[in-house]
Amino acid sequence: MTNIRKTHPIMKIINHTFIDLPAPSNFSAWWNFGSLLGICLILQIMTGLFLAMHYTADTTSAFSSVTHICRDVNYGWMIRYMHANGASMFFICLFIHIGRGMYYGSYLLLETWNIGIILLFTTMATAFMGYVLPWGQMSFWGATVITNLLSAIPYIGTDLVQWIWGGFSVDKATLTRFFAFHFILPFMITALAMVHLLFLHETGSNNPTGINSDSDKIPFHPYYTMKDIMGFMMMFMTLLTLVLFSPDMLGDPDNYTPANPLNTPPHIKPEWYFLFAYAILRSIPNKLGGVLALVLSILILITLPMTHTAKQRSMMFRPMSQCMFWILVANLITLTWIGGQPVEPPFILIGQLASLSYFTIILIMMPLINLLENKLMKW
């Protein structure tokens, strides 16, 4: 009798995706993060569902309902902090996953890469709307500042902002629609992730060497399932340590003050995972210019396949490109730090220099160094 996993219509899909999938034999630990993102997504949907059971999307009771979850619901505090810090883990995995793609030239799988960029935008939108829901000071003012950026769009800007707000300021209508979108978007992310996997399995995975690995494949299960479980355990330990010992480490104390439209916090800033883009936004004195730079700081990922001038796919054997890559990582860490600092000297200048070097490294330095390496290797 033929094995059911190879004949049953649904089991067959699961089998070809997670069990009998031919995978390169030389995956490093950097290839763990795709599956970790899947686990993060499941965790966020589950904890989010339980939070939604007790949450009230109304300006008068949203803050109280979150307090009620933390005080009165059984393990409500844990569900809430798992969800909040789970988002941080999600973005850590996301940034490493993208960094891995940049380092090893995975962006040459065009469809997979482009769906990934759409996934990144959708995840950022979901996280932003989730941050508004507790209706604390930073929720309210973050929503006001970020949505207000759309008013920089010529001609339709002001109307667009008021249409998104559902009124003349961030209010009950805004909170209700943000809750609705925050609930539906993770399911869209799940669907997009499936398309992401579909396109990946059309071409097969890249590997650390960047060389075609058709001649040397191993089944995904048990080799990489075991390797992934190791990754899950490490991630869960990190997440639980964060949740149980310092759940508010990555949050903002201002969000424990109920939203007050009459009192502006001294420093309005988003969650840590948006700070690099926020720093780029603030480094340009012009409003429209800042908004464009903000969008381009993510959209720039689309240009990577076009600016890939190297003869080798991976950076594994290209020390100069490796050096440039780690300078880019250091640059992003600097931008993240600047995004959390007040707008005053010397932070303004550091932010402007870091923003300029971010775009320069990706658009100019990387392609030039690739060409130089080609020359040095006589290719």
From Swiss-Prot:
GO terms for cellular component: mitochondrial inner membrane; respiratory chain complex III. The keyword Electron transport applies. The chain crosses the membrane at residues 33-53, 77-98, 113-133, 178-198, 226-246, 288-308, 320-340, 347-367. Heme b b566 binds at H97, H196. It is a multi-pass membrane protein. GO terms for molecular function: metal ion binding; ubiquinol-cytochrome-c reductase activity. Binds 2 heme b groups non-covalently. Its cofactor is heme b. Gene3D superfamilies: Cytochrome Bc1 Complex, Chain C. CDD domains: cytochrome_b_C, Cytochrome_b_N. It comes from the Eukaryota. Belongs to the cytochrome b family. This is Cytochrome b. It comes from Ctenodactylus vali (Val's gundi).
